Regions:
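Acidic-and-aromatic substrate-binding clefts and catalytic sites of carbohydrate-active enzymes
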Residues: 7-18, 39-41, 54-62, 144-146, ...
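Boundary/entry segment of secreted carbohydrate-active catalytic domains
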Residues: 1-35
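Aromatic- and acid-rich polysaccharide-binding/catalytic face
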Residues: 24-36, 135, 141, 190-196, ...
Length: 246
């Protein structure tokens, strides 16, 4: 218990009793695999019915409730994953009126949607699970390309790896805003992280480092999540160590 050793899990994975017992025996942190991602929590019908173009509505589906209830009942701290991501975020979230075929909204509208989305997610979860220990949250996920620059603008559902966030904002300003809003609404003591993969690629590592360093100096970001999709042949120990020590 000197530090956290965690695992990612989903509703399906914790359903068998053996899996529950394994998690409780070996880990003291859980990251919901899909259950806190935007496409799981956003409610298009409720957002349209609400009639407020800047206030996306959220829900807690059965899959999310199952994982969070398991963690709350067993005093398992969780790491929230994730508020802002180019993937698993429905296109309608970026469209006028939350309509499937609506025009892309302005930065000013998206600012308010992002803030309200983060607020609504946190408020909804805290209200239903008041004893849940959310000790960390991945605020922004996988915003960088391997060359160290931002992802190309566009729909990830049309162009693999493209970002509607970049389509709306055109630069990394949405990352700063996401951390600003998250810091405003997450529970007291919850640490905020930028999360990505392949940080051991030097160009990507340096791009992430420069951004996170600036966020940290502004007291907005507490650290970096390294997904560590590793094999025995790549990356080398030297590359991985260089990324950690950066």
């Amino acid at each position: 218990n000197y530090f956290k050793i965690g695992t990612a899990t989903t509703q399906q994975e914790i359903a068998p009793l053996n899996n529950k017992n394994l998690i409780l025996h070996h880990f003291n942190s859980v990251t919901p695999g899909n259950e806190l991602k935007p496409d799981c929590l956003l409610d298009q019908n409720a957002s349209i019915a609400n009639g407020n173009n800047i206030n996306p509505q959220v829900k807690i589906p059965a899959s999310t409730r199952s994982v969070l209830k398991f963690c709350e009942q067993n005093n398992l701290p969780i790491r929230g994953h994730v508020f802002v991501w180019h993937s698993q975020t429905p296109d309608w979230f970026f469209n006028e009126g939350f309509e499937t075929n609506g025009a892309t909204v302005s930065k000013e509208i998206m600012d308010q949607r992002m803030e309200n989305y983060i607020k609504n997610v946190v408020d909804t979860i805290v209200a239903e699970f008041p004893n849940l220990n959310i000790y960390a949250w991945d605020v922004v996920n996988e915003a960088f390309s391997e060359n160290g620059g931002m992802r190309q603008p566009g729909s990830n559902y049309v162009i693999d790896g493209a970002s509607r966030w970049m389509e709306v904002y055109g630069d990394n300003s949405f990352i700063y805003k996401a951390f600003t809003y998250a810091k405003k609404y997450v529970p007291e003591g919850c640490k905020l992280y930028y999360n990505d993969y392949n940080e051991y690629i030097e160009s990507k590592r340096d791009g992430i480092y420069n951004l996170v360093k600036d966020l940290h100096e502004k007291n907005l970001c507490d650290g970096v999540g390294m997904q560590s999709h590793l094999s025995t042949s790549y990356p080398s120990v030297q590359l991985y160590r260089a990324a950690v020590e950066k």
